Amino acid sequence: MQTIIWNHLSETEKRKVIMRPVQQNGKNIQQAVNAIRENVAYNGDRALFELCEKFDGVKLDKLIVSADEIQAASSRISVKLRNAIEQAKTNIEAFHKAQQNQEIDLEIQEGVRCQVVTRPISCVGLYIPGGSAPLFSTVLMLAIPAKIAGCKKIVLCSPPPISDEILYTAHLCGVETIYAIGGAQAVFAMAQGTESVAKVDKIFGPGNAFVTEAKRQVAQNSTAIDMPAGPSEVLVIADESADPEFVASDLLSQAEHGADSQVILVATCETLAKETALAIERQLALLPRAETVRKALNHSRIFIAESLEQAVEISNEYAPEHLIVQTKNARKLLPYLDNAGSIFLGAYSPESMGDYASGTNHVLPTYGYTKTYSSLGLADFSKRMTVQELTPKGFKNLAETVEVMAEAEQLAAHKMAVSVRLAKLNI
């Protein structure tokens, strides 16, 4: 990791050094995803079977995972892992239940009543990546709030063969239907519907560049998505009180997600920065994914800040997905931290806790989107509607205001909708 003293940089250099690595979502990916979209649209299930054999090397005779398969998978989960998943589920449920909306019902002025009511999104689709390290924890993060929100139908797609952990967790969380479908084709199947796959209203979940491009495309049509996605990232703010072994472990735990991940350390102490760099090398030697981690570290940075105030400024400008604060009084910085997907305060709040079991959601905006997007929560699985109801007296008292404004905007029919009612009022 390159070490840079922040105050030695010009303003132009500062902007450049906090830029993310360029995402490889080029024309080739877009063209490949376009072809998949057309194939699924025209050929439905047949396309899904063909693409599964082509990309996953699995020849399926059905797309829906049976109850017997789910039960068999669940029986293979160890008691130790079951207990861990259930503990995480309990914590995540508690935190997301606390997010339930309070209904708003106000009399704005006499005879004018306004409300906000919340309704669940009817049908949601969850995408869970497969591969050598199946993300069953993401099932918890998506299915639990969907269930609490009251979504009527929850379906899940994951590339075959689906791991026992994903099947068990999905069943535990109340997912109704599980499809053995992966990649961009899963996104298009859920967005468009096929003979076997239910059309959904909103799609959630992470994925590779092809899945991300497919989500971008469906979001331009009639299917909503959770948020824009990019490579995973973490920024750590640390002062002289931080333990370099802790800081190193937090940076490495994020770097192991992928070669395109980025990790940033903003330290107020050069000694800590040097000790952390040495700790990274020691710990790296123990990791099975060391090659991937090294690639991520190649475009990662250590910044030396002159103060915690400057460290906060750097963090707010970078706007990380994960922000870890390892300082003497970490909570005191919280009021000044404006842009982050999830914040981890103190030496004993590693990102791993939020990734799995503290209760917060690990589905977070990346690539600087935390300046405008929030971490996933209960609100993402529902929508708000406003309601207004006026009595004749309330209508009359507000009528002139609306007529004047409608006339000023030259919307005569808007004014008329008020005038015809006024003419029939006897109050």
Curated annotation (Swiss-Prot):
PROSITE patterns: HISOL_DEHYDROGENASE. The keyword Secreted does not apply. Its EC number is 1.1.1.23. Pathway: Amino-acid biosynthesis; L-histidine biosynthesis; L-histidine from 5-phospho-alpha-D-ribose 1-diphosphate: step 9/9. The keyword Zinc applies. Substrate binds at S232, Q254, H257, H322, D355, E409, H414. InterPro entries: Ald_DH/histidinol_DH (IPR016161), Histidinol_DH_CS (IPR001692), Histidinol_DH_monofunct (IPR022695), Hstdl_DH (IPR012131). One of its GO terms (cellular component) is cytosol. Disulfide bonds: none annotated. Zn(2+) binds at Q254, H257, D355, H414. Its cofactor is Zn(2+). The active site is at E321 (proton acceptor), H322 (proton acceptor). GO terms for biological process: L-histidine biosynthetic process. NAD(+) binds at Y127, Q185, N208. It holds the Pfam family Histidinol_dh. One of its GO terms (molecular function) is zinc ion binding. It catalyses: L-histidinol + 2 NAD(+) + H2O = L-histidine + 2 NADH + 3 H(+). Keywords: Amino-acid biosynthesis, Histidine biosynthesis, Metal-binding, NAD, Oxidoreductase, Zinc. Binds 1 zinc ion per subunit. HAMAP family: HisD. Catalyzes the sequential NAD-dependent oxidations of L-histidinol to L-histidinaldehyde and then to L-histidine. Belongs to the histidinol dehydrogenase family. This is Histidinol dehydrogenase. It comes from Haemophilus influenzae (strain ATCC 51907 / DSM 11121 / KW20 / Rd). The lineage of its organism: Bacteria, Pseudomonadati, Pseudomonadota, Gammaproteobacteria, Pasteurellales.
